[in-house]
Amino acid sequence: MKGLKKKTTTYRLPKAKKHLVREESGLNVYPSTQDRELILQKKQTLAISKLYELKFGNYFDDILKISLPYLKKQFSDAELRELFDLLKSYHANSTRECVDYFGKVYCELVKKQYQMRTSPHYDTELCNFIGDKNSQIKIIWGDCYQVLKRLKSESIHLMVTSPPYYNAREYSKWENLNDYFLDMKEVITECYRVLDNHRVFVFNVGDIYDNDRLVTRSVWGKRRIPLGAYFIRLFEEVGFTFIDDFIWDKGEVQTQRHKHTNTPYPFYQYPINCYEHILIFHKHRLDKTRYPCPICGCLKVNDNTQSEIGLQSWECDNENCFVRSKSNRGKRFSLKTNITQRHQAEEYKISETLIRKWRKDIVNFPPVIKINSKGKNILGHTAPFPEDIPEVAVLNYTYPGEVVLDPFAGSFTTAIVASKYNRIGIGIELNKVLFRDNVIRILKKETSQIDLYSGYKKYAEYDLLHFTKTHRQKIMEVTG
């Protein structure tokens, strides 16, 4: 009828069929999971291709032109993006700055790869505590083996320590000498992992006269135990290279033990130990990763040979390198020489006084006086070592800003000395009840000038003593 609206019928398809109609009509095709992955892969490939075409307008372009094939083999796409982003954000004023910065970020990315392979479950909070720049002295209370296991691989630049002597002190009790060395080997194995490659461990230990308890517990089982020799063997088993042994001459013997004044006859007399070993070990983990030439910054290098056990060296194969020999040979270098030769400037010079003092391998300086006139132990430690040892270690084997660790910290002498020379000093100590009061008193006294002039907080504490398998209670105390 005229004026009436014609009724229309709407047919609604089920949702699945509606999609099917759309696909068949070509209006909206939904890609499969496999197709979506291919699309994403193409986008990433396109992004990486554009990344390779990026121009910096400086010497980075020359380095990347030669080094790109090697970079593709070494890094993932994500790592390459990180590398390019770092280069893009850096404003270099010279070719030398380009070479140095490229080498720096390249080495950092390679180290990050190694750390993820060897310490994927490191303790993020603990590592952040160590990396916090608000304090130069880090006090960590806990079992050193457990603490070391939570650190990133190759994150420490120097280690200096004196271990708890086998049953020579009231706080160090083992069933026998074998148990002692089993514990020490566990700790030193973790130290090897945590110490940076081509770096140094300075280890102070003295030989003792005691019973190893392997045959008898009787007093007649006592003998001279050459701990220094045993530790050298242990370090080498773990992977360290033994370099040197300084003999610390402690001067006149103060003790009256074993004097046998009432029996001045043959076979009753023997000398008292008045020396200790200061053992020097290098870590040379063989690393065949290709490293850039320190002269031109390029990765076009040839595998040369091992210049030392565990130390890989390279020869630059870039014909346009700035330095070539008369026979047209490229620069020969290693990761170790890249570290050492980059720091040959006036501010890194070691004083003539220190060089002369440690020129001979027998060094004389007195032990720490820990008992005052009232017979009280003013340091709270039965075997503190003098500042001379960490001082020579810090100045000979680190640069300003680097990290120094003492896994058996005691009175934290190493950490204090490291901070005096503008290094980050870290100490790990198990006996908080025994040492803390005296340690804090010493730190407040020793670090007062540091606080006044540098703006750093005196020290920071991190407590891992309450760690258990099911629950970890961590207490962070920052004292300012």
Where do the PLM segments sit?
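PRPP-dependent phosphoribosyltransferase catalytic core
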Residues: 436-480
